[in-house]
Amino acid sequence: MSDFSSRFCAARRACIARDFAKLNPEQRRGVLTTEGPLLLLAGAGSGKTTVLINRIANLLTYGRGSDCGEVPAGASEDDLAFLENYPAQPTADERRRMRQLCAVEPPAPWQVLAVTFTNKAAKELRERLEAFGIAGAGDIWALTFHSACVRILRRDIDKLGFSNDFTIYDTDDCKRVVKDILKEMDLDEKTFSPREVLAVISKAKDELLSPQDFSKKWAGSGD
């Protein structure tokens, strides 16, 4: 990397970091890391969600700018001097120029997927993103794992030959269906426990077995 490139990248990172000056050093490190996977290990109330929200803000504003070694085509010595001497209280035009110089392939809000475990946590995440003032925050996919997958399936499952108008069954629904099938086949629930039947079906799904493959597997097992 040339002296110009290394200085430009250092100045760019410093300018971006100023947007997150209120965070502590470890939080800021997580926010500014954009390349590759990142694991945050911290206790309750230590600011993990704060890091996540600020990291999304960084990605949407600056893309990979804080963590890459690329210099924009046409970057000049004047641009470098501007970043290295970026004022403490910039004007709106200066701030706009800084963001243009520092941004590297920022994604659109709808390209960001923020997955959490509960509906309550997903709702809080969406509310905090909107309160943060991120443009287009409503388009960010801040969802639970299940709701994210359902949204994808509703949109694209027809490409696999299935209907988009499907119904999701919970555990009780599944047990009821298995019980109905056992009754229809005149099989004793004490011998074929619905819970055990569901466990076998779940294992087959994990192994990506089709109903036909599953039938062949058990037909040859002797059980």
Show which residues each predicted segment covers:
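P-loop NTPase Walker
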Residues: 1-163, 168
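ATP-hydrolysis module of ASCE/P-loop NTPase motor domains
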Residues: 34, 117, 137-140, 158-223
